[in-house]
């Protein structure tokens, strides 16, 4: 038996020693919701999902001493790979530090960076119609050199360093710049692929499209090994920990003027 299983068995034994009238009925599972586009910064009208906004609630949830697990609900189309990986790592660090099982539940979507965060789960569940995957890297923008010519505007750029103005949208693209950008994308993509392989391992199907950037429904994602089961949070937690299990939504503590305090 694992240490976690031994601890649970011991906790159950000790609980039975307490007179029934003094026992707390049902297991309490802390729930953290991670939703929205993953960005380093945003606005009060469109709050971002990043480590600073996610960390306080995560720290609070993993501090539930008697909870055997932490449930994380994810609803994100992705965004910054850096912030995605930082959130992933914080969840794994807390899980190891507090000895908690992590159950991830995908709502509408956990794609790209959203799926990267989902990899922090020891188990991943999704709705059959959820969207999962999109294991790839994309970047884009616009170019305006011809427009400037038409309106009679001359672009003047002065640099110290031959590549300081690389990918300037007001200058024609150069093949060398495109190749450099692609090399960065490939490097980031490989980090993502390595994370998926490390976390999902032998569960993954041998499918050539798995790391192509495609996305799938939860049902197909299960067949590909991207998710472990098709279920909703409430049903799965009650099935696992008993019908009296209570789900407790955890949010970031509020600071001065009622604003949520950012974490680090």
List the model feature ranges, each with a label.
Residues 1-127, 138-264:
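N-terminal organellar transit peptides
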Residues 131:
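Short glycine/proline-centered loop/turn elements that form peptide/ligand docking sites
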């Amino acid at each position: 038996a694992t240490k976690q299983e031994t601890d649970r068995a011991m906790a159950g034994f000790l609980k039975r020693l307490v007179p029934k009238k003094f026992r707390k009925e049902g297991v309490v599972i802390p729930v953290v919701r991670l939703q929205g586009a993953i960005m380093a910064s945003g606005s009060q009208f469109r709050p971002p999902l990043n480590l600073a906004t996610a960390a306080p609630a995560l720290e609070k949830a993993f501090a539930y001493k008697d909870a055997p697990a932490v449930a994380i609900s994810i609803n994100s189309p992705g965004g910054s790979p850096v912030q995605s990986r930082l959130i992933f790592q914080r969840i794994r660090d807390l899980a190891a530090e507090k000895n908690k099982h992590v159950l991830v539940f995908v709502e509408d979507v956990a794609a790209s960076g959203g799926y990267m965060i989902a990899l922090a789960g020891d188990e991943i569940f999704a709705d059959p119609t959820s969207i999962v995957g999109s294991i790839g890297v994309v970047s884009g923008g616009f170019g305006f050199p011809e427009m400037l010519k038409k309106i009679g505007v001359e672009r003047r750029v002065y640099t110290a360093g031959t590549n300081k103005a690389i990918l300037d949208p007001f200058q024609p693209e150069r093949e060398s710049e495109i190749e450099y950008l692609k090399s960065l994308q490939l490097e980031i993509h490989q980090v993502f692929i390595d994370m998926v392989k490390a976390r999902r391992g032998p569960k993954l199907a041998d499918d050539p499209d798995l790391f192509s950037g495609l996305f799938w429904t939860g049902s197909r994602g299960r067949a590909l090994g991207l998710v472990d089961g098709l279920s909703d949070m409430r049903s799965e937690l009650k099935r696992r920990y008993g019908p009296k299990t209570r789900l407790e939504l955890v949010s970031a503590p509020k600071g001065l003027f009622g604003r949520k305090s950012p974490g680090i």
